């Protein structure tokens, strides 16, 4: 383990207790660690002391990414892997009998996450020093470890093999031959050389050079540049999919599927359900033909029972079958993760049962499922539940014994908790927010519903408070952006519901307000209250106010636990002479996350880099990408999106210089409800919190800008705008003639917006003629008006799609529409109407170039940004 810190506070005791429990084979242990006490550090130390492989279970991808990043730093020389769901978008197949609606399966797989999953299983099979950070997706089925291992083969220099046999083995492992588009999971052949891009590697591939039927050389190279990076003596090639199946197993599975289909068809026909029988036979036989021909089919996971050789009701093969018996499982935020594991099975079972009942799938599809809680409990190795608020199951399994980690290494104590009446909670919150902002800290406000969050945000915005809201309608990348901007000080208050809880690291937060704290429920339970109170525990001046008209049991227990921890922490600090200090963490930590690789689409205004990184070549590359998006949107006739991207490009180019000096510059022109005078005061308040060095830097920047503007004003302007007297006075000669005169409004019709040489101001071909010009006083034939060279278009000529010359004289009458002779004399047949009709767009995907998946995603996402008034 690599770290600059040594265990402090309660950490040494907790590490010792947990290591003793592992040595004594205690199956379940509990680590009760408060927010900011270094639970991740303790887990890493336990792994180092026990020298065992470990699986870290996180409740969501955000915390999984955070843990992955931290363990990567703690163990740079070991195999730290990431195993989460690889779907960017997933719509499972389903049937709604009430409306007779069948929804096809639709998904989008993230290549980067898929590669990391392959890397995780490979590390488990090859190494002992493995740490896997996983989400709850690890209890879902993947390929059998026996089959996956059996399909693996090794090659080394000097081996003799047939080239055709090697290519056949690669195809059996579901590698694809790509002679041109050489990507992960593919291979190509060039004479006696075979190049393989393994499924678990990102920027390296292998070149197998053969002499006849003997392997002469194995080279590692960069697939992008072709540059050689190393020489290898042997390589082990793993399958391109966890669901790969050997041909004998596949043939046996096809026989079993046909047998089940035969029995199921007899059942449906006896019940008189002929439609379901016909549907099931058609769909299943198509899948069987695909399996026989290619070894795979769409929805192959529904036949996983036969492909893995399991019996009905057996647990599916999961990541837990790859984990060695001596491994440790750390369940992070166990009060959330454990109920998640228990809740995955039933919803999945109900959906698949409906599909089987109505003939869309065979009944065996219900064996493609996540683990039941009982199966997971029986399968898990030695476990440590880590939480500030352990649940009932964890405490029951550990016999009520737990390792406590209440003392923080920084000496911070839990924030004081105060109860105030809820009748005037909003006005009281506004006053507290102003005091907190004046001290330079941020505020978190938690409410009960999305509507309350948005309404409270609007009200605070009207009161002159810089505020945002965050709830489940906000896109995940937008949430990261909001948290980063809150820490930067771009706004002062964040209103949320259930997202302001586990794992939220905001050391700048000095005040947490919990509105309607007496409304009993899962949002105001003892666990939720303690977790929310913990958000203010990273700041030495943090405080929490519960707004309630009565003290509920959950509030009483939460305050009692918080006070117990405060007393213990204060005693420790007094005994050891520790002065508490706020937690310091880099703002970029929240963005340096593998979690961002789990997204492929984001709104154009969402930036995953910090402001300082969006400069120079990075900004240029970003602008180039946005310009490509703009052109693509225009090509797809989505002109509104193209215009938004164009405006964003323009704004970024204008901000390039200012962002490099001031990270808050992009909020300088943000809409504000207060007047200009108050706005100036508010900006002064922001500047007040800057250090002397920052204020000096901004002063020099302002002086440089002022000097540049003065120099620009001193230079002669060849293209200056003419003054009013120059534009309206007849015959007036300006003191300084510009090279180009601005035409009048009357002369600025279509096709007339051309500049006029300054020397011919009075001879303008586009200006309205004065009285002297009409009598030819300046040039031309005396007494005759001067005719312009270009005629001004009339209204008829300026209409849309009227570029032809208007017809002189009488316009011919419109001919009668042609009627079909078959319909002559019949009143029920209407003549065809040749008049222009509006273009009616069909639904997405019908006779058009639009992507139905994109259309559904646009309908599903409300596109909220957390800003008031949007």
From Swiss-Prot:
Q: Which Pfam families match?
A: Helicase_C (PF00271), ResIII (PF04851), UVR (PF02151), UvrB (PF12344), UvrB_inter (PF17757)
- GO BP terms, alphabetized: nucleotide-excision repair; SOS response
Give residue ranges for domain Helicase ATP-binding.
20-410
Gene Ontology molecular function: any one: ATP hydrolysis activity
Q: Which residues form the UVR domain?
A: 620-655
Note the CDD domains from the entry. Answer: DEXHc_UvrB, SF2_C_UvrB
Keyword tags: ATP-binding, Cytoplasm, DNA damage, DNA excision, DNA repair, Excision nuclease, Nucleotide-binding, SOS response
What PROSITE patterns does the record tag this protein with? HELICASE_ATP_BIND_1 (PS51192), HELICASE_CTER (PS51194), UVR (PS50151)
Q: Where is the composition biased (Basic and acidic residues)?
A: 793-808, 827-836
Q: Where is the composition biased (Basic residues)?
A: 679-689, 858-870
- Enumerate the spans annotated as Helicase C-terminal domain: 425-591
Write down the PANTHER family for this protein, in alphabetical order: UVRABC SYSTEM PROTEIN B
Subunit field text: Forms a heterotetramer with UvrA during the search for lesions. Interacts with UvrC in an incision complex.
Tell me which family the UniProt entry assigns to this protein: Belongs to the UvrB family.
- Report the function annotation for this chain: The UvrABC repair system catalyzes the recognition and processing of DNA lesions. A damage recognition complex composed of 2 UvrA and 2 UvrB subunits scans DNA for abnormalities. Upon binding of the UvrA(2)B(2) complex to a putative damaged site, the DNA wraps around one UvrB monomer. DNA wrap is dependent on ATP binding by UvrB and probably causes local melting of the DNA helix, facilitating insertion of UvrB beta-hairpin between the DNA strands. Then UvrB probes one DNA strand for the presence of a lesion.
Please provide the record's free-text comment about the domains of this protein. The beta-hairpin motif is involved in DNA binding.
Protein's UniProt name: UvrABC system protein B
Species, as recorded: Mesorhizobium japonicum (strain LMG 29417 / CECT 9101 / MAFF 303099)
